From Swiss-Prot:
Gene Ontology cellular-component annotations: extracellular region
Pfam families for this protein: Toxin_7 (PF05980)
Species in which this protein is naturally found: Pireneitega luctuosa (Tangled nest spider)
Alphabetical keyword list: Amidation, Disulfide bond, Ion channel impairing toxin, Knottin, Neurotoxin, Secreted, Toxin, Voltage-gated sodium channel impairing toxin
UniProt domain comment: The presence of a 'disulfide through disulfide knot' structurally defines this protein as a knottin.
Record has Coiled coil as a keyword: no
Any one GO molecular function term: sodium channel inhibitor activity
Function: Binds at site 4 of sodium channels (Nav) and inhibits the fast inactivation of cockroach channels. This toxin is active only on insects. Has a potent activity against S.litura larvae.
Pharmacophore, annotated site positions: 8, 12, 22, 24, 26, 28, 30, 32, 34
Family per record: Belongs to the neurotoxin 07 (Beta/delta-agtx) family. 02 (aga-3) subfamily.
Record SUPFAM superfamilies: omega toxin-like
Protein name stated in the entry: Delta-amaurobitoxin-Pl1a
Disulfide bonds: 2-18, 9-23, 17-33, 25-31
Length: 37
């Protein structure tokens, strides 16, 4: 499965964000999937 909006993600390991989302690490200490539109 993939990660959706607001779910915790990691650039270096899976699972990755779903299509249409990217892993944003701006809101430390966690990275979260955000909509890339």
């Amino acid at each position: 499965g993939c990660l959706g909006e607001g779910e915790k993600c990691a650039d270096w390991s899976g699972p990755s964000c779903c299509d249409g989302f990217y892993c944003s690490c701006r809101s430390m200490p966690y990275c979260r999937c955000r909509n890339n539109s």
